[in-house]
């Protein structure tokens, strides 16, 4: 979370450092293990740990192939090895991410809304998101929207057409 002048919000950064401390060594090991699993299965993957301001946040893995189903196979093996305790999984197309449970847009939005209400009182909140995981913060909003071809829109369309 950033302050209005674009600088790091130290209070929020401190909260995140506390929430993520147990994952700081685990995330690089998880990234390496996921890439090795892909290699063992015969797939070309790339991956990294997303880090900002000296704090490791989550693991991202993508494939270099033509079939997004590859990541589902890699995920199944990572899960079978019990490597994701305390983590959320975000899988969407060529994107497989492992996020510690203390890292969630919802928590940041809750904090931002709390601060905003202190300064400006209660006011309407609009939310915009494109993935199913965005629903975690979007339900804090009075109204929300999603792009027509997003993962979220496709999921809603599938539910309507069932």
State the predicted function of each range.
Residues 119, 139-162:
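Asp-based, Mg2+/Mn2+-dependent phosphohydrolase catalytic module
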Residues 18-22, 86-88, 116-119, 153-156:
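Short, surface-exposed, polar/charged, turn-prone segments marking secondary-structure boundaries
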Residues 1-39:
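Active-site phosphate-binding/coordination module
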Residues 30-126, 132-140:
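Conserved acidic, metal-coordinating active-site core of Asp-based
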């Amino acid at each position: 979370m950033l302050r209005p002048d674009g600088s790091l919000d130290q209070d929020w950064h401190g909260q995140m450092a506390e929430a993520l401390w147990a994952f700081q060594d685990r995330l690089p090991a998880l990234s390496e293990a996921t890439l090795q699993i892909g290699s063992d299965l015969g797939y070309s993957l790339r991956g990294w740990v997303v880090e900002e301001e000296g704090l490791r946040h989550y693991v991202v893995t993508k494939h270099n192939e033509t079939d997004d189903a590859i990541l589902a196979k890699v995920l199944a093996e990572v899960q079978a090895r019990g490597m994701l305790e305390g983590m959320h999984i975000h899988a969407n197309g060529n994107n497989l991410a492992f996020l510690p449970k203390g890292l969630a847009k919802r928590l940041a939005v809750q904090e931002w809304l709390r601060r905003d209400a202190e300064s400006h009182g209660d006011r309407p909140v609009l939310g915009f998101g494109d993935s199913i995981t965005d629903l975690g913060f979007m339900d804090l909003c009075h109204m929300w929207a999603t792009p027509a071809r997003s993962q979220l829109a496709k999921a809603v369309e599938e539910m309507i057409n069932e």
